[in-house]
Amino acid sequence: MRPRSGGRPGAPGRRRRRLRRGPRGRRLPPPPPLPLLLGLLLAAAGPGAARAKETAFVEVVLFESSPSGDYTTHTTGLTGRFSRAGAMLSAEGEIVQMHPLGLCNNNDEEDLYEYGWVGVVKLEQPELDPKPCLTVLGKAKRAVQRGATAVIFDVSENPEAIDQLNQGSEDPLKRPVVYVKGADAIKLMNIVNKQKVARARIQHLPPRQPTEYFDMGIFLAFFVVVSLVCLILLVKIKLKQRRSQNSMNRLAVQALEKMETRKFNSKSKGRREGSCGALDTLSSGSTSDCAICLEKYIDGEELRVIPCTHRFHRKCVDPWLLQHHTCPHCRHNIIEQKGNPGAVCVETSNLTRGRQPRVTLPVHYPGRVHRTNAIPAYPTRTSMDSHGNPVTLLTMDRHGEQNLYSPQTPTYVRGYPPLHLDHTLAPHRCSLEHRAYSPAHPFRRPKFSSRSFSKAACFSQYETMYQHYYFQGLSYPEQEGQTIPSVTPRGQSRAFPPSGASSLLFPTMVHVAPPTHVESGSTSSFSCYHGHRSVCSGYLADCPGSDSSSNSSGQCRCSSSDSVVDCTEVSNQGVYGSCSTFRSSLSSDYDPFIYRSRGPAVHLEGSPPPEELPAGHSQSAGRGEPWLGPASPSGDQLSTCSLEMNYSSNSSLEPRGPNSSTSEVGLEVSPGAALDLRRTWKGGPEGPSCACCFEPQPFPPGSGIETSAGGSSLFLGPRLLEDCNPPSGEPQLGSSQGLYGLHSDHYPRTDGVKYEGLPCCFYEEKQVAHSAGRGNGCYTEDYSVSVQYTLTEEPPPSCYAGPRDLSQRIPIIPEDVDCDLGLPQDCHGMHNHSPWGGALSLDVPRLHWSLGTTREEEQAPCYQAEVQPGCSPEEAGASRASLSSAPQDTQESHALAAEASGPGSGPGIGTGA
């Protein structure tokens, strides 16, 4: 048996390459390459296309007559070729058969056919007619001359006639010449021989384009390819989106698994909503219903707490979170929270135990506040207190990151010293009555001042002591014992009482009207509010100058001027603010706003000079010499202003005292009435204070801190003293790191205690309480507030002595740049201008600028009441006896100041701002 491989026996796996052989074993040539095939196809298609252009369609119509006389038509289609000897035109006519020899007859006597016939000529073999009389082309010409519209030649027996016809292409005939052969020629000759009547119609049709179907194929192929590409791209995009969606869904599921779920408990109100910690239940805070299904929370229901502290039913919010990955309320993305510190929560359930401090701020009232600079936003949270009132919590967990907001914080904010908080809430229990906020009057604006005050013995959350606050920055509270080298702790801080760990940010500067309680000649420095107080408000006014219901008869009164100003001029000052506290009685729901004019301050003749400075700081002060302040820089700024309260007969104020009477513009004092004029500086207490009523608590014995009745600073502020001293070593008021500085006569008196940083806007209340012996003509609610603003970002033009530069001003509205130079005309500096006139001016407290001041000098009285010139010597002696502990030199300087302002200040008695 032969091997299948066909090879040698020793190589069975080897195969032979068989050659292609023909039937007899000859080798076949390899197949032609593809370009060669394409060339052949084009070459073959070329002549075919040329022949297609020469094709002539001959339509023969036969007319057969019937016995009835009707004609029956039969159409036969034939195909021929146009000869180059004639034109390629369409022709039609009756078919006439002609013999070739008949065309050779030149006898003109023969009848000529009418024009419009088609001649059909059958050519014979060349052997039968070796010497023709005319050529084929000549015969065609003879037929056209005799009136033929077209000539058809049958060349089946004489194919050479085609070449003879093509030779006449130089001078072609104007009528078509067509030749037929083969089967078409046989059909034509049969019709001509058998039929008597027939018509021929020759048509020249345009040849079909060979690329017609080819172009359609290209278009279809291109369309299919583009469709496939688009389909592939769509599929890829869809798959990518599905993968991304699956990834996002996985991340959402992971984030959802990490979120906490708690059970709702409506009984425990002490816990704040969204607080961090291992709490299994949520209390009923300000929101007790689900924002998705709008149903109330039921005890025991499982709630989902989103990192943005919003809570919803778990069954309601989970599908939304899985699909949209954002909080339905605030659009907080639950997936993109990686790398962010997130919301910092503070557990406030144990605040009463003193574990963690908290800053409680009231809810904002409606209004527009103009900031003087951009303040970075710090996290706040609105919660409910124990009485069900919403409060704003400023919370920020430090965790050792002291520079958390330092890149975004302005320079003046970073310059504030940290708070030193070393007392807690736990030791002191406020025994005063806390009045809960009445839900019947939500967000009702107060009757007087920019914040409401409580008639009860203590403050509620809406009527708290933080009646008007303005953040200048935030600093971290330091533990007790930590000291900043640049700032020496001076005195007891009267800021927010912390407890335990210092993990919260506290405001370093807050504008607060200090608590005052006037009870017929007695003054309590830290009692709760019982009346209307004027505070620095940043709200825009409601044009109180147009009040027509008050007894001032449409005229406004500026506290620092004895002249009457028309209200139309004052009302235009609403956008700038002013020192005036004119009360509009049109509605009890709007604030009396603070105004400020744009003109320079005018020191009226006869008004007393500015309050005297200690002898070590000024040589001319204290001797009754006229005071001239330095020139003021440009800009619409607020200088030292004296703010006063004003009653009107129609204003909706609280009930006055039984012995009070209505006056047109101010306070009426009966002649000869002895006034107990006191000037109280509201500052820090002698010890830790209550968080709600700020009632001072005594320091523990042995603490090494001594206080006096003068009080201390209420809030911390920037460092006010810089090294801007003359060669004599006398310290002077210089620039500070904060935005605002404090005029020297706003420093509180603290005997035995070192000074602490002071707030930018300190409040001085000048109380006029009627003596106990005479009980008519004095309002217990009337008072005056003196506010001093000082620009401390920029250093003064020169180092002036102490607080002499009263014209240093700050911009209240940043956009107001086209203001006048100088101080406002309706504002007085601290020029000993009493709200009741020049005779009731007060003396500045003696300030001690160096730390080496003796104890006796520090224990000098802070204030001394000026004696009214119209009072009797007995009354004057009685008033001076109350402050007999003052040093003799200070009393003498005050007496000189009173004498210097004697006649000019007399008419101010009996008038109010």
UniProtKB/Swiss-Prot annotation:
Stretches the record annotates as Disordered: 1-32, 601-669, 855-913
Biased composition (Gly residues): 903-913
A Gene Ontology term for the protein's cellular component: plasma membrane
Cleavable signal peptide: 1-52
Residues in RING-type zinc fingers: 290-331
Its membrane topology: Single-pass type I membrane protein
Name of one Pfam family that matches: zf-RING_2
InterPro entries (alphabetical): Znf_RING, Znf_RING/FYVE/PHD, ZNRF-3_ecto, ZNRF3_Arkadia_E3_ligases, ZNRF3_Znf_RING
Pathway connected to this protein: Protein modification; protein ubiquitination
CDD domains: RING-H2_ZNRF3
Protein family according to the UniProt entry: Belongs to the ZNRF3 family.
Function: E3 ubiquitin-protein ligase that acts as a negative regulator of the Wnt signaling pathway by mediating the ubiquitination and subsequent degradation of Wnt receptor complex components Frizzled and LRP6. Acts on both canonical and non-canonical Wnt signaling pathway. Acts as a tumor suppressor in the intestinal stem cell zone by inhibiting the Wnt signaling pathway, thereby restricting the size of the intestinal stem cell zone. Along with RSPO2 and RNF43, constitutes a master switch that governs limb specification.
Protein name: E3 ubiquitin-protein ligase ZNRF3
Gene: Znrf3
